[in-house]
């Protein structure tokens, strides 16, 4: 397994992160728990989750999977949807209970996708106040944010953070071979994160499978491309053992790509990427869980 440094935190984490959303998919919870155990046995230390995934089932399954001393072997991340101080504090406490832990290593502001989301994060009685109190209490260690819609909203978040003299520890965003051509987080946000020492967490390397439907790239090419960027972690969902095997193989076979190799890969995807067809999470609303469940934010 490859290991990388998580931005300015100095934490060493696996370059492949186990996505939490897909752990809620197997009908039998034991299958999901087996995936968690196998991932740890094979060197994955970064665990991804979110308060809202599958009605909390993803966190509950991961919590069971991290019993018997395994929690101490991983770097645990989850996310929250609250847009107020009270809802954020409540969701942190619920995640701690489900994950069966006394602290979360990294917690992230989920779905920074609307133009007002950055302002709400820094507002009076907003999420940041709850996060700072939770950090002081030892419930969380690091703070980040995520989003999949438009790089402009991430840039706005970074600008507001600078105005408030606040440093984010991480930022999670789509990084894939299609993103390079359309509303590109890689072009517009990634350089700012690297410059500021904010850990880059790549997600949707295969665009929830949509990138593969283009027929232009293979799963390994998708993962290798994301690993070749200055990412600390590439998070990938694994609802079956075969998909975990694929992620492990990508880490095992990864070698830094030459500029010519990157250019050739992007050339294969350019025409397919230009309309956003294979990144529907940027153009459609069905991927915006907080928009579909506004009560989560209150």
Task: Indicate where each model-derived feature is located.
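N-terminal binding-site loop/beta-alpha segment at the start of enzyme catalytic domains
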Residues: 1-73, 130, 136
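A general structural detector for well-ordered alpha-helical segments in enzyme core domains, enriched
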Residues: 2, 31-36, 58-65, 91-95, ...
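Conserved, mostly hydrophobic/aromatic
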Residues: 6, 18, 47, 62, ...
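Active-site mouth loops of central-metabolism enzymes
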Residues: 19-30, 77-87, 115-120, 211-217
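Structured C-terminal cap/extension of enzyme domains
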Residues: 30, 38-41, 45, 164, ...
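Short catalytic-loop micro-motif centered on adjacent basic/acidic residues
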Residues: 45-52, 77-79, 141-146, 172-173, ...
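Structural motif corresponding to the early beta-alpha repeats
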Residues: 53, 68-89, 110-113
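Glycine/proline-rich, positively charged
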Residues: 83-188, 194-201
């Amino acid at each position: 397994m490859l290991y990388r440094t998580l931005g300015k935190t100095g934490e060493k984490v696996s370059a492949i992160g186990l996505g939490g959303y897909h752990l809620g998919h197997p009908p039998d919870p034991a299958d999901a728990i087996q995936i968690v155990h196998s991932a740890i046995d094979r060197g994955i230390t970064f665990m991804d989750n979110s308060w809202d995934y599958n009605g909390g089932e993803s966190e509950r399954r991961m919590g069971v999977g991290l019993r018997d001393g395994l929690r101490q072997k991983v770097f645990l991340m989850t996310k929250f949807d609250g847009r107020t101080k009270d809802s954020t504090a409540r969701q942190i406490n619920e995640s701690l209970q489900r994950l069966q832990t006394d602290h979360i290593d990294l917690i992230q502001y989920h779905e920074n996708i609307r133009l007002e989301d950055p302002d709400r994060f820094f507002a009076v009685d907003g999420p940041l106040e709850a996060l700072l109190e939770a950090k002081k209490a030892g419930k969380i260690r690091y703070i980040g944010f995520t989003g999949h819609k438009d790089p402009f909203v991430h840039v706005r978040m970074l600008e507001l953070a600078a105005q408030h003299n606040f440093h984010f520890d991480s930022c999670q965003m789509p990084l894939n071979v299609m993103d390079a051509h359309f509303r590109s987080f890689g072009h517009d946000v990634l350089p700012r994160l690297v410059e500021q020492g904010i850990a880059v967490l790549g997600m949707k390397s295969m665009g929830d499978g949509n990138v593969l439907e283009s027929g232009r790239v293979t799963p390994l090419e998708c993962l290798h491309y994301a690993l070749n960027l200055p990412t600390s972690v590439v998070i990938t969902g694994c609802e079956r053992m075969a998909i975990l095997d694929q992620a492990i193989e990508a880490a095992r076979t990864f070698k830094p790509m030459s500029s010519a190799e990157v250019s050739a890969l992007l050339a294969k995807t350019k025409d397919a990427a230009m309309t956003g067809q294979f990144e529907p999470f940027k153009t459609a609303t069905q991927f915006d869980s907080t928009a579909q469940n506004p009560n989560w934010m209150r």
